[in-house]
Amino acid sequence: ALAAGGWVVCDRFTDATFAYQGYGRQLDLEKLAVLESWIQGDLQPDITLYLDVAPDVAAQRIAAREKDRMEVERRDFFVRVRQGYLDRASEHERFEIIDAGNPLQEVQAEVRLKTSEFIRRAHRG
């Protein structure tokens, strides 16, 4: 799709690798960067929407439903993962941070707004 000039939407990219494996599991960030470069070259998303939520709010939400394999991790793991995303966001202008601690309808509206703004800029550019 990219080669044909199309758009690709992903729910995860290498930012998740840095956050979960690098920060969460404390793997070597430099080695992850080498792998990222080797696998994807200079390919990066044009925009990244990061839905940020405080670890305590996330824990409350997780407790209200069935957990998956990642959600059984300890709180300190998620604190490190969140910091990984926030660090990546501070290093890359493509990040749009959305406060996912807000009610669902507000988060959805913010996602729609950021996506619409990006599409308008892309069509002008």
Where are these regions (language model features)?
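A glycine- and Lys/Arg-enriched "phosphate-lid" helix/loop adjacent to the NTP-binding pocket
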Residues: 12, 17-83
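Loop/turn-to-beta-strand initiation segments
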Residues: 4-7
